[in-house]
Amino acid sequence: APKGPSLFEVQDMIENSSKPIISAIHGTALGGGLEVALTCHYRIAVPSARCGLPEVKLGLLPGAGGTQRLPRIVGAQKALQMVTSGEHIPAKECLEIGLIDEIASEDSLLEDAIKFASVIVKENKPLVKVKENEENIKEDKGNHALFTAFRKSIARRTRGFLAPEYNIQCIEAAVNKPFEEGIKVERDLFTKLVTGSQSA
């Protein structure tokens, strides 16, 4: 039987689409759901929506580009907090940190997303490829002190667990390496966690 495309192939198709792709989020966009949303050109969510990368709670890290795209949107510091805590962020905060671009009405998400898309087309707005966005990470390139301080701040809570440290190493790679190299770091460390003894 023919095999469907892999998640990574789907993400590439979304990111490289010549038509605007908007992720319309309701409920929760967690883990892989958020990782797919991060490949879309824009994100819109209802007020009750929540987003997060909770893999660390299972002894894992986001394995579909989440650690590489997230800091390119929200910056290294917020990305570090999100991947090491696994917290679910409410829509209002997602908007404040730039994770989503607009809040829709609770009962008209589809209509609002279509309206949002038509404005993008009408105003000829760029189709944002998150993986190419260096703007939010450039000031942290080579800033080892940021990562050292962050490691210290969570040391007591995470002692003995590999996943928080590997998540930090992935964000560090996102900040300091080209996207494709960072993805390789993420996949290697993800594999180590999946095959190790600490993952659920």
What are these regions (language model features)?
Residues E35-T39, V83-L189:
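Amphipathic alpha-helical segments at domain termini/boundaries
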Residues L70, K78-E87:
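Short helix- or helix-capping micro-motifs
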Residues I14-L58, P62:
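Glycine-rich beta-to-alpha active-site loop
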Residues A1-H26, G66-Q68, I73, S199-A200:
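An acidic, glycine-rich surface segment that forms the CoA-thioester-binding/catalytic face
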Residues T191-A200:
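Long amphipathic alpha-helix in the N-terminal Rossmann-like dinucleotide-binding domain
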Residues G4, F8, G31, H88:
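Glycine-rich phosphate-binding loop at the start of an alpha helix
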